[in-house]
């Protein structure tokens, strides 16, 4: 009932300085089209109406409810936690260009511009409805970020063009084959001295069997077909296959920035 109004608001002129570039010819990966992710009809990429923003609006509220508010009032805790981790472990790191892969509604994209105001912040996603909503949302917050509809397996950015490449719970939403391609793209796009961080829920090896079993419920009951395997990835092996030095790969448990700030 609210969709027409939401579309109209999202299309209204904005002035924060961010951009939105859509590609109607982009082929949506089969790992999106073959299953309704999170049991949402049509997943997040399907266009229900012209200039659709429904998927973004639903996700914005839905993820808050799903996480029971633990991602913070702006749903940005994952991005905030990466930033806090970087400030603690690499205090002198000051990225000038930042790329968020699978940015969805840009919840975790926005904090990078707030914390690194001199940086150019870009986000990519395959889902146009999510990107339209993300653009309208970030502009309404007065935060200029640059969003484009691209597959993270093959992007149009120049080699070595980003100092920081991040993703926020993207890995368990993509296939193993796609993740290998994404890692190779990260290697191509990363500037010398740059950092790649893929933030995910804890690996199964970091929890007891019961907790792993409970979390694995999502694989079969929340249309998360890649959940199980993604939580068994070996970072050094994935880094080496993509062309990175495995000795420089790392795996860390970063505390919640939202919880720490309470």
Placement of each model-derived feature along the sequence:
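N-terminal auxiliary segments of SAM/dcSAM-dependent transferases
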Residues: 1-50
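Conserved alpha-helix/loop element of class I SAM-dependent methyltransferases that forms part
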Residues: 58, 72-94
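Conserved class I S-adenosyl-L-methionine
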Residues: 94-104
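Class I SAM-dependent methyltransferase SAM/SAH-binding core
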Residues: 99, 107-154
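A short acidic, Gly/Pro-enriched loop at the edge of an enzyme's catalytic core
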Residues: 153-165
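A short SAM/SAH-binding and catalytic strip from SAM-dependent methyltransferases
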Residues: 163-177
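A short glycine-rich, Lys/Arg-flanked "PGG" loop and its adjoining helix->strand segment in the class I
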Residues: 180-192
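C-terminal alpha-helical "lid/dimerization" subdomain adjacent to the S-adenosyl-L-methionine
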Residues: 197-253
């Amino acid at each position: 009932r609210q969709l027409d109004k939401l579309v109209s608001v999202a299309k209204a002129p904005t002035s924060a300085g961010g951009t939105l570039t859509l590609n109607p010819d982009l082929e949506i990966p089969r790992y999106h089209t073959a299953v309704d992710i999170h049991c949402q009809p049509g997943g997040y990429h399907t266009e229900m109406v012209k200039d659709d923003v429904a998927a973004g609006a639903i996700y914005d509220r839905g993820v808050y409810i799903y996480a029971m508010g633990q991602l913070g009032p702006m749903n940005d805790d994952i991005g905030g936690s990466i930033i806090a981790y970087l400030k603690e472990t690499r205090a002198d790191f000051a990225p000038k260009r930042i790329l968020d892969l699978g940015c969805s509604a840009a919840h975790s994209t926005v904090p990078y511009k707030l914390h690194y105001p001199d940086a150019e912040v870009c986000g990519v996603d395959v889902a146009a409805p999510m990107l339209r909503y993300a653009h309208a949302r970030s502009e309404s917050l007065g935060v200029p970020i640059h969003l484009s509809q691209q597959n993270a397996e093959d992007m149009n950015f120049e080699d070595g063009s980003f100092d920081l490449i991040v993703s926020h719970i993207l890995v368990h939403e993509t296939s193993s084959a796609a993740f290998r391609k994404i890692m190779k793209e990260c290697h191509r796009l990363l500037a010398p001295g740059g950092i790649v961080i893929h933030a995910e829920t804890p690996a199964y090896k970091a929890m007891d069997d019961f907790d792993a079993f409970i979390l694995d419920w999502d694989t079969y009951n929340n249309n998360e077909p890649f959940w199980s395997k993604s939580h068994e990835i070996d970072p050094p092996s994935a880094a080496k296959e993509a062309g990175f030095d495995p000795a420089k790969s790392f795996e860390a448990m970063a505390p919640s920035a939202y919880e720490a700030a309470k």
